[in-house]
Amino acid sequence: MQVEVKLKENAYKVYIDELEELEFDSKVFILSNPKISGLHLKTLLSKIKAKEIFIATVKDGEEYKNLSTMEEILNQMFNSKLDRKSVLISFGGGVISDMGGFAASIYQRGIDFINIPTTLLACVDAAVGGKTGVNNNFGKNLIGTFYQPKAVYCESSFLKTLSFRELAAGMAEFIKMAAMFDDSILDFIEKIDEKSFLNATCENEIFTQIIARSIELKSRVVEQDEKESGLRMLLNYGHTFAHVIENFTDYKLYLHGEAVAIGMVMANQLALNLGLLDKMQSQKIKDILLKFGLPISYKINNVDEFYEAFFMDKKSSNKKINFVLASPLGKGFIKGDISKEDIIATLREFQ
């Protein structure tokens, strides 16, 4: 199956379960991590033909997605003597996708790159759309670029080696999209047999359906708003809270999807307090998240510090915090005129 991301410039295709032989008349630089390399690199190498193939592995995890690791990647690219015709392949989860795309975008002012995601989260979200970047002490993804891949290959067979926790984290991003754009997808999610899914014993068909539906939805959003000036901001539902949680826990306590799950619950509580979302719909999201074993609570130790951290969010402007909310489920919107008192009151409910 193929889904085309129809951008005015740099259009590309997402191939779902269609990874066949890839031929390059250039050098290829594969960026991955030790775990994925051990599990799947042999399979990938059997499908690539190129002038030369270089392999680099870096530690995986949000705590390593920083400028220090980026410098390490760039040094390996220079040591490999890549030129502007070379191709970088990001082979891993969302962290590898973000860093690989960023490295490709700044190496010699830009070389081609391909995403081959190996986690559900990367398949449904991170690998498509052209967002690249790294974290720093001030927050998440504050250093980066918009740089589209030349192609994306999502292979559901790679997902079979994921843990219960990793699969659930990917589902959080899928739930996010449904809550923002299409509540019928929430009905689809509710019907999934979570036991077989989370134990990765189901047929590839379920993964394929999830990936296809999410990519079709996200591609339509990116086509309308590639640089995140309006509609695409809705894909940050739950992320305003999640990024603060991740930063405050040094990116070690939660997987990104887990933090997003908590962030959605917090965003819904804010919407509920403002009279924009009813209690039944707020509970529906909680129930779906719990169905997949995702966390729905976080203890805020210092409400004022948490509030101030919002202002490092990329969606904040003119000293206002733009929150992405659902009202009702399936219809997201951005609200930037919420008083400090209302925000603080919601945060206090999580102390």
Curated annotation (Swiss-Prot):
TM spans (from-to): none
Q: What is its EC number?
A: 4.2.3.4
Quote the InterPro entries the UniProt record gives. Answer: Dehydroquinate_synthase (IPR050071), DHQ_synth_AroB (IPR016037), DHQ_synth_fam (IPR030963), DHQS/DOIS_N (IPR030960), DHQS_C (IPR056179)
One GO process term, biological-process aspect? amino acid biosynthetic process
Q: Where does NAD(+) bind?
A: 60-65, 94-98, 118-119, 131, 140, 158-161
Which GO MF term does the entry hold, naming one? nucleotide binding
Q: Identify which top EC class this enzyme belongs to.
A: lyase
**Cofactor requirements of the protein:** Co(2+); Zn(2+); NAD(+)
Query: Which compartments is it annotated to reside in?
Result: Cytoplasm
Q: Where does Zn(2+) bind?
A: E173, H239, H256
Indicate the family of this protein.
Belongs to the sugar phosphate cyclases superfamily. Dehydroquinate synthase family.
Q: What is this protein called?
A: 3-dehydroquinate synthase
Query: In which organism is this protein found?
Result: Campylobacter jejuni subsp. jejuni serotype O:23/36 (strain 81-176)
